[in-house]
């Protein structure tokens, strides 16, 4: 397959996504096919975002690593020493993707490391490995193109996470601001009693102890539930089951107490 045809194959994957998130596993499979190498997309913290195997490596430690989808911390940190593409590293290199305990079996093993950079920061690393055949310029062009695509995708995911976090926080702040002073006081006591993200409590007991009416507690819970911040369910005489749905809620509640 010529370089142009291989590039088109990668482009076809992006075009088929049509604005939807690119699946790192599919991306790895395509890279594996066009570069003909084992492909590992590794995050900053060593999480295996995607991988594809072209040549099986029979090694228990490697199998466990793939099953856990996590690269060793020491190896992951060492990858940050590589700031530009390093190709055809042999099995004696500290950056080899082949198991060092079986060097004699993988004497022809070659590894190529491609930093994944986006927005001016290191986002991860693309690790390629194969036996025997050197990585040529065409392979490196495809690898660097792929790392750029992966970097853009990681940045997009990060932006979505930030947006979602801001949205969750805004929902919580609006829900809390809708509570009256007595309702807010009731909620503070409820979650003090709950001491976690979910549990069972008896509203009447809290009402008696704090000196507020039960209806204040009911109204406060209803407001939070309608905002999608919590879920509550009456269990009759046993009390009310409450579960926090928005992970920003307890953080914002804690801030109010400290202010």
From Swiss-Prot:
GO terms for molecular function: DNA binding; DNA-binding transcription factor activity; GTP binding. Keywords: Cytoplasm, DNA-binding, GTP-binding, Nucleotide-binding, Phosphoprotein, Repressor, Transcription, Transcription regulation. It comes from the Bacteria. The modification Phosphoserine is found at residue 215. The keyword Transcription applies. Activity of CodY is modulated by interaction with two types of effectors: the branched-chain amino acids (BCAAs) leucine, isoleucine and valine, which are signals of the nutritional status of the cell, and GTP, which may signal the energetic status of the cell. Residues 203-222 bind DNA. One of its GO terms (cellular component) is cytoplasm. Signal peptide: none annotated. SUPFAM superfamilies: Winged helix' DNA-binding domain (SSF46785). Residues 1-155 are annotated as: GAF domain. Changing residue 183 to A: Cannot form tetramers. It is found in: Cytoplasm. The keyword Nucleus does not apply. Pfam families: CodY, HTH_CodY. One of its GO terms (biological process) is regulation of DNA-templated transcription. Modular protein made up of an N-terminal effector binding GAF-type domain and a C-terminal wHTH DNA binding domain, separated by a helical linker. Homodimer. Homotetramer. May form homodimers under conditions in which energy sources are sufficient (active state) and homotetramers under insufficient nutrient conditions (inactive state). DNA-binding global transcriptional regulator which is involved in the adaptive response to starvation and acts by directly or indirectly controlling the expression of numerous genes in response to nutrient availability. During rapid exponential growth, CodY is highly active and represses genes whose products allow adaptation to nutrient depletion. Belongs to the CodY family. This is Global transcriptional regulator CodY. It comes from Bacillus cereus (strain ATCC 14579 / DSM 31 / CCUG 7414 / JCM 2152 / NBRC 15305 / NCIMB 9373 / NCTC 2599 / NRRL B-3711).
């Amino acid at each position: 397959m010529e370089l142009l045809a291989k590039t088109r194959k990668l482009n076809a994957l992006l075009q088929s996504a049509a604005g939807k998130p690119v699946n790192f596993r599919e991306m790895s499979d395509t890279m594996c096919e066009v570069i003909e190498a084992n492909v590992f997309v590794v995050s900053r913290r060593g999480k295996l975002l995607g991988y594809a195997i072209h040549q099986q490596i029979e090694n228990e430690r490697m199998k466990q690593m793939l099953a856990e989808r996590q690269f060793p911390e020491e190896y992951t940190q060492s990858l940050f020493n590589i700031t530009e593409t390093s190709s055809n590293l042999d099995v004696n290199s500290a950056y080899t993707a082949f198991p060092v305990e079986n060097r004699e079996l993988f004497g022809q093993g070659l590894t190529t490391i491609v930093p994944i950079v986006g927005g001016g920061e290191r986002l991860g690393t693309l690790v390629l490995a194969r036996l025997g055949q050197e990585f040529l310029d065409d392979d490196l062009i495809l690898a660097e193109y792929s790392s750029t695509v992966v970097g853009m995708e990681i940045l997009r995911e990060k932006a979505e996470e930030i947006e979602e976090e801001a949205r969750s926080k805004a929902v919580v702040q609006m829900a809390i601001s809708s509570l009256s002073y007595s309702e807010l006081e009731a909620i503070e006591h409820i979650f003090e009693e709950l001491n976690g993200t979910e549990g069972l409590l008896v509203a009447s007991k809290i009402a008696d102890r704090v000196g507020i009416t039960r209806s204040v507690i009911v109204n406060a819970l209803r407001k939070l539930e309608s905002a999608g911040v919590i879920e509550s369910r009456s269990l009759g005489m046993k009390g009310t089951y409450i579960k926090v749905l928005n992970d920003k809620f307890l953080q914002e509640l804690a801030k109010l107490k400290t202010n």
